[in-house]
Amino acid sequence: MSDLRFRCLVDNDFCDIAPFEPYIEKGSSDMGLALIAFDESELDTIKSLLNETQLEGSDGYLYILSQGSVEKKGKMPHSVMKAYRYYKRYKKKQNRAAAHIERELSHSGDGIRKVSGGRFSAYKYTDQENKICFPFRLRASKNKNEPLFILLHGAGAMGSDNLKQLFDNLPLYKQLIKTDCNILLPQAPFGSNRGEAMQNYIKSIKRLVDELPADFDRKRIYIIGTSFGGCCAWQLIYLFPEYFAAAVPVMGGLCLDRDYEKYDIGRLVKTPIWAAHSSDDTNVRIDSDDYCAAELEKLGADIKCTRWDKYGHTMSGKFYRTENWTEWCLSKKLK
Protein backbone atom coordinates (compact mmCIF):
# COMPACT_ATOMS: atom_id res chain seq x y z
CA MET A 1 0.00 0.00 0.00
CA SER A 2 3.00 2.36 0.31
CA ASP A 3 2.91 3.17 -3.42
CA LEU A 4 -0.83 3.82 -3.45
CA ARG A 5 -1.77 7.29 -4.64
CA PHE A 6 -5.10 9.06 -4.63
CA ARG A 7 -6.61 11.55 -7.01
CA CYS A 8 -9.68 13.78 -6.84
CA LEU A 9 -11.04 16.90 -8.48
CA VAL A 10 -11.88 19.94 -6.38
CA ASP A 11 -13.08 23.40 -7.35
CA ASN A 12 -11.75 26.82 -6.42
CA ASP A 13 -13.25 26.61 -2.92
CA PHE A 14 -10.43 24.17 -2.12
CA CYS A 15 -7.86 26.49 -3.67
CA ASP A 16 -9.04 29.29 -1.37
CA ILE A 17 -8.15 27.13 1.63
CA ALA A 18 -4.90 25.62 0.41
CA PRO A 19 -2.53 27.29 -2.05
CA PHE A 20 -0.90 24.97 -4.57
CA GLU A 21 1.89 23.03 -2.87
CA PRO A 22 4.07 20.16 -4.19
CA TYR A 23 1.45 17.59 -3.20
CA ILE A 24 -1.31 19.48 -5.01
CA GLU A 25 -1.05 19.18 -8.76
CA LYS A 26 -3.14 21.05 -11.32
CA GLY A 27 -4.16 19.04 -14.35
CA SER A 28 -7.15 20.90 -15.77
CA SER A 29 -7.02 23.88 -18.09
CA ASP A 30 -6.54 27.33 -16.61
CA MET A 31 -8.05 28.07 -13.21
CA GLY A 32 -11.23 26.02 -12.99
CA LEU A 33 -11.08 22.57 -11.41
CA ALA A 34 -7.86 21.57 -9.69
CA LEU A 35 -6.45 18.07 -9.92
CA ILE A 36 -4.87 17.01 -6.65
CA ALA A 37 -2.82 13.87 -6.22
CA PHE A 38 -1.24 12.62 -3.02
CA ASP A 39 -0.04 9.46 -1.33
CA GLU A 40 -0.90 7.94 2.03
CA SER A 41 1.83 9.83 3.90
CA GLU A 42 0.15 13.10 2.93
CA LEU A 43 -3.35 12.12 4.03
CA ASP A 44 -3.04 14.00 7.32
CA THR A 45 -2.53 17.22 5.38
CA ILE A 46 -5.34 16.57 2.94
CA LYS A 47 -8.02 15.21 5.26
CA SER A 48 -8.15 18.42 7.29
CA LEU A 49 -9.13 20.29 4.12
CA LEU A 50 -11.71 17.92 2.65
CA ASN A 51 -14.88 16.54 4.13
CA GLU A 52 -16.54 13.43 2.68
CA THR A 53 -14.83 13.02 -0.66
CA GLN A 54 -14.62 10.31 -3.29
CA LEU A 55 -11.02 9.48 -4.13
CA GLU A 56 -9.66 7.55 -7.08
CA GLY A 57 -6.88 5.14 -6.13
CA SER A 58 -3.95 4.28 -8.36
CA ASP A 59 -4.80 0.60 -7.76
CA GLY A 60 -8.00 0.99 -9.77
CA TYR A 61 -10.42 1.18 -6.80
CA LEU A 62 -12.61 3.98 -5.51
CA TYR A 63 -12.09 5.19 -1.93
CA ILE A 64 -14.18 7.37 0.36
CA LEU A 65 -12.40 9.84 2.62
CA SER A 66 -14.69 10.42 5.59
CA GLN A 67 -13.90 11.71 9.08
CA GLY A 68 -10.18 11.24 8.60
CA SER A 69 -10.24 7.63 7.42
CA VAL A 70 -10.22 6.03 3.98
CA GLU A 71 -12.69 3.28 3.11
CA LYS A 72 -12.10 1.12 0.04
CA LYS A 73 -15.05 0.78 -2.36
CA GLY A 74 -15.57 -0.85 -5.76
CA LYS A 75 -13.57 -0.87 -8.96
CA MET A 76 -13.18 2.37 -10.89
CA PRO A 77 -14.54 2.72 -14.42
CA HIS A 78 -12.10 2.65 -17.33
CA SER A 79 -12.43 6.42 -17.85
CA VAL A 80 -10.90 7.11 -14.44
CA MET A 81 -7.86 4.93 -15.12
CA LYS A 82 -7.48 6.81 -18.39
CA ALA A 83 -7.37 10.04 -16.37
CA TYR A 84 -4.53 8.62 -14.31
CA ARG A 85 -2.52 7.92 -17.43
CA TYR A 86 -3.18 11.48 -18.56
CA TYR A 87 -1.89 12.79 -15.22
CA LYS A 88 1.35 10.81 -15.55
CA ARG A 89 1.88 12.18 -19.06
CA TYR A 90 1.20 15.69 -17.78
CA LYS A 91 3.86 15.38 -15.08
CA LYS A 92 6.44 13.95 -17.49
CA LYS A 93 5.78 16.78 -19.93
CA GLN A 94 6.10 19.34 -17.16
CA ASN A 95 9.40 17.85 -15.98
CA ARG A 96 10.79 17.79 -19.53
CA ALA A 97 9.87 21.45 -19.98
CA ALA A 98 11.62 22.41 -16.74
CA ALA A 99 14.75 20.49 -17.78
CA HIS A 100 14.71 22.18 -21.20
CA ILE A 101 14.56 25.64 -19.62
CA GLU A 102 17.41 24.78 -17.27
CA ARG A 103 19.58 23.66 -20.21
CA GLU A 104 18.76 26.78 -22.22
CA LEU A 105 19.58 29.08 -19.32
CA SER A 106 22.94 27.39 -18.78
CA HIS A 107 23.96 27.67 -22.45
CA SER A 108 22.43 31.01 -23.47
CA GLY A 109 23.08 34.60 -22.56
CA ASP A 110 20.41 37.20 -21.91
CA GLY A 111 18.33 38.58 -24.75
CA ILE A 112 16.81 37.79 -28.13
CA ARG A 113 18.12 35.33 -30.71
CA LYS A 114 16.63 35.12 -34.20
CA VAL A 115 15.94 31.60 -35.42
CA SER A 116 14.33 32.11 -38.84
CA GLY A 117 12.82 34.80 -41.03
CA GLY A 118 9.53 35.01 -42.88
CA ARG A 119 6.26 36.81 -42.41
CA PHE A 120 6.18 35.79 -38.75
CA SER A 121 9.88 35.61 -37.90
CA ALA A 122 10.85 33.07 -35.24
CA TYR A 123 12.94 34.05 -32.21
CA LYS A 124 14.03 32.75 -28.83
CA TYR A 125 14.15 34.92 -25.73
CA THR A 126 16.27 34.19 -22.66
CA ASP A 127 15.70 36.07 -19.42
CA GLN A 128 18.34 35.07 -16.89
CA GLU A 129 16.92 37.40 -14.22
CA ASN A 130 13.53 35.68 -14.21
CA LYS A 131 15.04 32.25 -14.96
CA ILE A 132 12.97 31.58 -18.05
CA CYS A 133 13.37 31.20 -21.81
CA PHE A 134 10.68 30.89 -24.45
CA PRO A 135 10.15 31.20 -28.21
CA PHE A 136 8.14 33.94 -29.85
CA ARG A 137 7.01 35.10 -33.27
CA LEU A 138 7.14 38.67 -34.51
CA ARG A 139 5.43 40.17 -37.51
CA ALA A 140 7.13 43.53 -37.92
CA SER A 141 5.51 46.32 -39.88
CA LYS A 142 7.40 47.68 -42.88
CA ASN A 143 6.68 51.16 -41.60
CA LYS A 144 8.07 52.87 -38.53
CA ASN A 145 6.12 54.01 -35.50
CA GLU A 146 3.16 51.65 -35.99
CA PRO A 147 1.32 50.10 -32.99
CA LEU A 148 2.27 46.80 -31.34
CA PHE A 149 -0.31 44.11 -30.57
CA ILE A 150 0.76 41.43 -28.08
CA LEU A 151 -1.31 38.25 -28.42
CA LEU A 152 -1.24 35.89 -25.44
CA HIS A 153 -2.49 32.35 -26.01
CA GLY A 154 -4.44 29.92 -23.83
CA ALA A 155 -2.97 27.07 -21.77
CA GLY A 156 -3.46 24.56 -24.59
CA ALA A 157 -0.81 26.28 -26.72
CA MET A 158 1.97 26.13 -24.13
CA GLY A 159 5.17 24.48 -25.32
CA SER A 160 8.39 25.20 -27.18
CA ASP A 161 7.56 24.47 -30.84
CA ASN A 162 6.87 28.17 -31.65
CA LEU A 163 3.83 27.07 -33.67
CA LYS A 164 0.90 26.36 -31.38
CA GLN A 165 0.44 30.00 -30.42
CA LEU A 166 0.07 30.89 -34.12
CA PHE A 167 -2.92 28.57 -34.51
CA ASP A 168 -4.35 29.53 -31.12
CA ASN A 169 -4.51 33.19 -32.19
CA LEU A 170 -5.84 32.56 -35.69
CA PRO A 171 -9.19 34.37 -35.10
CA LEU A 172 -7.26 37.52 -34.17
CA TYR A 173 -5.13 37.61 -37.33
CA LYS A 174 -8.17 37.94 -39.53
CA GLN A 175 -8.90 41.24 -37.82
CA LEU A 176 -5.34 42.52 -37.40
CA ILE A 177 -4.28 41.65 -40.95
CA LYS A 178 -6.34 44.65 -42.11
CA THR A 179 -4.22 46.94 -39.92
CA ASP A 180 -0.65 48.12 -40.41
CA CYS A 181 0.81 47.02 -37.10
CA ASN A 182 3.45 44.91 -35.37
CA ILE A 183 2.29 41.59 -33.88
CA LEU A 184 4.11 39.78 -31.07
CA LEU A 185 3.23 36.18 -30.19
CA PRO A 186 5.17 34.73 -27.23
CA GLN A 187 4.76 31.04 -26.38
CA ALA A 188 4.63 30.20 -22.69
CA PRO A 189 6.69 27.17 -21.61
CA PHE A 190 4.67 24.13 -20.54
CA GLY A 191 3.71 24.41 -16.87
CA SER A 192 4.03 28.22 -16.68
CA ASN A 193 0.34 28.77 -16.02
CA ARG A 194 0.58 28.93 -12.25
CA GLY A 195 2.65 30.06 -9.30
CA GLU A 196 6.17 31.44 -9.59
CA ALA A 197 6.61 30.11 -13.15
CA MET A 198 3.61 32.17 -14.28
CA GLN A 199 4.93 35.31 -12.57
CA ASN A 200 8.34 34.85 -14.20
CA TYR A 201 6.72 34.46 -17.62
CA ILE A 202 4.60 37.59 -17.12
CA LYS A 203 7.57 39.73 -16.06
CA SER A 204 9.61 38.39 -18.98
CA ILE A 205 6.99 39.50 -21.50
CA LYS A 206 7.45 43.09 -20.40
CA ARG A 207 11.26 42.77 -20.61
CA LEU A 208 10.92 41.23 -24.07
CA VAL A 209 8.82 44.17 -25.30
CA ASP A 210 11.49 46.57 -24.01
CA GLU A 211 14.12 44.74 -26.11
CA LEU A 212 12.12 44.00 -29.27
CA PRO A 213 13.97 44.46 -32.60
CA ALA A 214 11.14 46.52 -34.10
CA ASP A 215 10.60 50.26 -34.46
CA PHE A 216 7.08 50.62 -33.06
CA ASP A 217 5.07 53.31 -31.29
CA ARG A 218 5.62 52.73 -27.57
CA LYS A 219 2.57 54.82 -26.77
CA ARG A 220 0.40 52.29 -28.62
CA ILE A 221 1.13 48.88 -27.11
CA TYR A 222 -2.01 46.74 -26.89
CA ILE A 223 -2.27 43.43 -25.07
CA ILE A 224 -4.88 40.82 -26.01
CA GLY A 225 -5.14 37.59 -24.01
CA THR A 226 -7.33 34.50 -24.17
CA SER A 227 -8.03 32.27 -21.15
CA PHE A 228 -4.60 31.74 -19.53
CA GLY A 229 -3.46 34.61 -21.75
CA GLY A 230 -6.33 36.71 -20.42
CA CYS A 231 -5.10 36.06 -16.87
CA CYS A 232 -1.61 37.14 -17.97
CA ALA A 233 -3.02 40.30 -19.55
CA TRP A 234 -4.71 41.26 -16.27
CA GLN A 235 -1.47 40.62 -14.37
CA LEU A 236 0.62 42.65 -16.81
CA ILE A 237 -1.52 45.78 -16.60
CA TYR A 238 -1.66 45.36 -12.81
CA LEU A 239 2.11 45.01 -12.43
CA PHE A 240 3.00 47.66 -15.02
CA PRO A 241 0.41 50.46 -14.94
CA GLU A 242 0.75 53.18 -17.60
CA TYR A 243 2.82 50.88 -19.84
CA PHE A 244 0.08 49.50 -22.09
CA ALA A 245 -2.26 51.74 -24.07
CA ALA A 246 -5.13 49.25 -23.71
CA ALA A 247 -5.88 45.64 -22.75
CA VAL A 248 -8.47 43.11 -23.93
CA PRO A 249 -8.49 40.16 -21.50
CA VAL A 250 -10.92 37.49 -22.75
CA MET A 251 -12.04 34.64 -20.44
CA GLY A 252 -9.33 35.66 -17.96
CA GLY A 253 -9.20 37.12 -14.47
CA LEU A 254 -7.00 38.98 -12.02
CA CYS A 255 -8.36 37.90 -8.62
CA LEU A 256 -8.62 34.17 -9.29
CA ASP A 257 -8.06 33.35 -5.63
CA ARG A 258 -11.03 35.65 -4.79
CA ASP A 259 -8.97 37.31 -2.07
CA TYR A 260 -10.12 40.68 -3.37
CA GLU A 261 -8.82 42.80 -0.51
CA LYS A 262 -5.17 42.12 -1.34
CA TYR A 263 -5.52 43.73 -4.78
CA ASP A 264 -5.21 47.48 -5.24
CA ILE A 265 -7.68 47.84 -8.11
CA GLY A 266 -6.73 51.51 -8.42
CA ARG A 267 -3.54 50.38 -10.18
CA LEU A 268 -5.69 49.48 -13.20
CA VAL A 269 -7.45 52.84 -13.53
CA LYS A 270 -5.10 54.40 -16.10
CA THR A 271 -5.27 51.45 -18.53
CA PRO A 272 -8.37 51.23 -20.76
CA ILE A 273 -9.76 47.68 -20.44
CA TRP A 274 -12.26 45.70 -22.47
CA ALA A 275 -12.99 42.52 -20.53
CA ALA A 276 -14.99 39.74 -22.19
CA HIS A 277 -16.34 36.68 -20.42
CA SER A 278 -19.26 34.27 -20.28
CA SER A 279 -21.20 33.70 -17.07
CA ASP A 280 -21.35 29.94 -17.72
CA ASP A 281 -17.57 29.56 -18.03
CA THR A 282 -16.56 26.70 -15.73
CA ASN A 283 -12.83 26.81 -16.57
CA VAL A 284 -12.07 30.39 -15.60
CA ARG A 285 -14.90 31.78 -13.53
CA ILE A 286 -16.36 35.19 -14.25
CA ASP A 287 -16.32 36.33 -10.59
CA SER A 288 -13.02 38.19 -10.88
CA ASP A 289 -14.05 40.10 -14.01
CA ASP A 290 -17.36 41.07 -12.41
CA TYR A 291 -15.58 42.32 -9.29
CA CYS A 292 -12.89 44.28 -11.16
CA ALA A 293 -15.41 45.84 -13.54
CA ALA A 294 -17.64 46.99 -10.67
CA GLU A 295 -14.71 48.47 -8.74
CA LEU A 296 -13.24 50.18 -11.80
CA GLU A 297 -16.60 51.72 -12.69
CA LYS A 298 -16.75 53.21 -9.18
CA LEU A 299 -13.30 54.72 -9.77
CA GLY A 300 -14.35 56.22 -13.11
CA ALA A 301 -11.98 54.06 -15.16
CA ASP A 302 -12.21 53.42 -18.90
CA ILE A 303 -13.70 49.93 -18.55
CA LYS A 304 -15.85 48.13 -21.09
CA CYS A 305 -17.39 44.69 -20.51
CA THR A 306 -18.84 42.07 -22.81
CA ARG A 307 -20.72 39.62 -20.59
CA TRP A 308 -22.49 36.75 -22.31
CA ASP A 309 -24.57 34.03 -20.70
CA LYS A 310 -23.74 31.24 -23.13
CA TYR A 311 -20.77 29.75 -25.02
CA GLY A 312 -18.90 28.92 -21.79
CA HIS A 313 -15.14 28.69 -22.24
CA THR A 314 -15.44 28.86 -26.02
CA MET A 315 -16.75 32.41 -26.35
CA SER A 316 -13.44 33.93 -27.45
CA GLY A 317 -13.73 32.95 -31.13
CA LYS A 318 -17.13 34.59 -31.52
CA PHE A 319 -15.98 37.65 -29.60
CA TYR A 320 -12.94 38.19 -31.82
CA ARG A 321 -15.00 37.67 -34.98
CA THR A 322 -17.96 39.89 -34.11
CA GLU A 323 -16.72 42.70 -31.84
CA ASN A 324 -14.77 45.77 -32.96
CA TRP A 325 -11.94 45.30 -30.47
CA THR A 326 -9.29 46.28 -33.04
CA GLU A 327 -10.79 49.71 -33.67
CA TRP A 328 -11.37 50.17 -29.95
CA CYS A 329 -7.71 49.47 -29.17
CA LEU A 330 -6.44 51.78 -31.90
CA SER A 331 -8.52 54.61 -30.46
CA LYS A 332 -6.43 54.43 -27.25
CA LYS A 333 -2.98 55.94 -26.79
CA LEU A 334 -0.75 56.74 -23.83
CA LYS A 335 -0.39 60.42 -23.08
Could you say what each language-model-derived stretch is?
Residues 78-148, 181, 236, 292:
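A domain-start/cap signature at the N-terminus of enzymes
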Residues 276, 282-335:
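C-terminal catalytic histidine-bearing segment of alpha/beta-hydrolase fold enzymes
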Residues 2-11:
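Short glycine-/aliphatic-rich beta-strand segments at the starts of folded cytosolic domains
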Residues 179, 268-273:
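Short, proline-enriched alpha-helix->beta-strand connector loops that line the catalytic pocket
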